[in-house]
């Protein structure tokens, strides 16, 4: 379980984030042959019936952020890597590349089984898939505190709030769309959600006072973590060393998994419609994921309503002789962050209900009268998720020169900056293959992690059509 905390800390360093929608490829919204556009708007139907090749039918992985890996991980001598906390990285160099609020999200949408067919007066869909979304947001001042610390006899940091959240579940969705009038089509999708893991931590109203005598933190912090079979002990229960009232602190090092199982249950609804204004102009709208998830075996922890002392984050060095690898540095940063949060366990084994993050999609498409195989579209997507909310507007050009081939290219403006996307879709008889990206990745690391910002998306699928 220590590794989970370490990877979450690593994600926090790669940016600090907000939510991204676990949905289909936005670039395919206006393509008739794109089989999964019903995941963007339940009123949309593809031009063929289909069933997916298990797991390979629709794979969609993406990250979004206004910073990148290169803001937090730096090269050193000997072809090694180190974090921004290394004294070889200057504060000006590190802080100069950050935003006032640094955000990142990582998302996975995988269709295990999916099918669509005509019947009962309309188009019907069945989806069983994995949905995973993790988000972080961190103010720049927090990283300044980590890197610089005390810069005079008395230093005060007013950090505001920061948070990290992850939600993971299996979704079973049944959809139906039909034409009501010649120019109006409506659709709905009913979803049953089976919970895996939910975790959320938030620190608000944070004030850090640094003096020659002591470093003191005051914040309102809360944490919920829910997963079947997960045991979250206190330091007193695990036998860890502590002093004073520290016995009720969460012992992150000794979190254990006993017997995994169903971690929660939820329901959700998608609603959508399309309306043909005139022969060559169609508008559409959809609201997705109106619903809730009820989690079981939830552990709740919070800070005390009083300040606590903190020794600060280590100024990590990397010498060839000390074996201080990047992995070791992330471990050390994780330990420091756990001490910083100062979360006392209040309850365990409880219930927790949370509304889902909803997504609003609005679209308009105009086909050229003289060549209706070429169309231009605009799609607006807004993720409604509190501090993790985001929005984007995307202009696209789409062409279907052949009955079995279509493609699109688009330009978008998002909460994280501008981006370009594309999709190609081959759908001859029997088979359908699509590949696309909503965010064209720039420079990447050897592990294919975006360096300059976290905006990256890849979607592909192989399906059988009939």
Model-identified regions with their sequence ranges:
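Subset of outer-membrane beta-barrel
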Residues: 23-466
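Bacterial Sec-dependent N-terminal signal peptides
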Residues: 1-26, 364, 466
């Amino acid at each position: 379980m220590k590794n989970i905390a370490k990877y979450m800390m690593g994600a926090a360093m790669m940016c600090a984030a907000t939510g991204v929608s676990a949905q289909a490829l936005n670039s395919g919204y206006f393509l008739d042959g794109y089989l999964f556009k019903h995941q963007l708007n339940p009123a949309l139907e593809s031009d063929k019936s289909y069933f997916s090749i298990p797991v390979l039918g629709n794979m969609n992985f993406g990250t979004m952020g206004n910073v990148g890996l290169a803001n937090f991980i730096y090269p050193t001598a000997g072809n090694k890597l180190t974090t921004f906390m290394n004294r070889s990285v200057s504060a000006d160099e590190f802080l100069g590349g950050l935003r006032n609020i640094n955000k990142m999200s990582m998302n996975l949408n995988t269709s295990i089984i999916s099918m669509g067919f005509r019947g009962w007066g309309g188009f019907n869909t069945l989806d069983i898939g994995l949905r995973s979304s993790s988000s972080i947001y961190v103010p720049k001042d927090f990283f300044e505190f980590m890197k610089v610390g005390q810069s005079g006899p008395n230093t005060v940091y007013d950090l505001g709030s920061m948070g990290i959240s992850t939600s993971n579940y299996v979704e079973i969705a049944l959809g139906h769309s039909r034409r009501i009038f010649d120019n109006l089509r409506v659709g709905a999708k009913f979803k049953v959600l089976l919970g895996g893991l939910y975790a959320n931590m938030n620190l608000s109203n944070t004030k850090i006072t640094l003096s020659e005598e002591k470093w003191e933190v005051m914040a309102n912090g809360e944490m919920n973590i829910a997963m079947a079979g997960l045991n979250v002990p206190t330091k007193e229960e695990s036998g860890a060393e502590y002093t004073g009232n520290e016995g009720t602190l969460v012992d992150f090092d000794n979190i254990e998994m006993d017997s995994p199982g169903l971690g929660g249950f939820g329901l959700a609804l998608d609603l959508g419609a399309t309306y043909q204004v005139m022969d060559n102009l169609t508008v559409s709208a959809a609201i997705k994921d109106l619903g809730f998830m009820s989690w079981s075996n939830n552990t709740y922890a919070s800070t005390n309503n009083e300040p606590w002392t903190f020794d600060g984050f280590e100024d990590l060095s990397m010498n060839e002789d000390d074996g201080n690898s990047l992995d070791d540095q992330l471990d050390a940063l994780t330990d420091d962050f756990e001490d910083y949060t100062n979360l006392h366990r209040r309850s365990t084994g409880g219930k927790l209900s949370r509304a889902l993050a909803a997504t609003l999609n609005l679209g308009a498409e105009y086909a050229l009268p003289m060549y209706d195989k070429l169309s231009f579209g605009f799609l607006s997507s807004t993720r409604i998720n509190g501090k993790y909310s985001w929005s984007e507007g995307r202009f696209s050009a789409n062409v279907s020169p052949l009955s079995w081939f279509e493609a699109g290219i688009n330009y978008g403006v998002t909460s994280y900056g501008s981006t370009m996307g594309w999709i190609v879709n081959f759908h001859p008889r029997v088979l359908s293959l699509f590949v696309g990206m909503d965010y064209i990745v720039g420079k990447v690391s050897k592990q294919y992690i975006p360096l300059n910002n976290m905006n990256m998306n890849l979607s592909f699928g192989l399906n059988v059509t009939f």
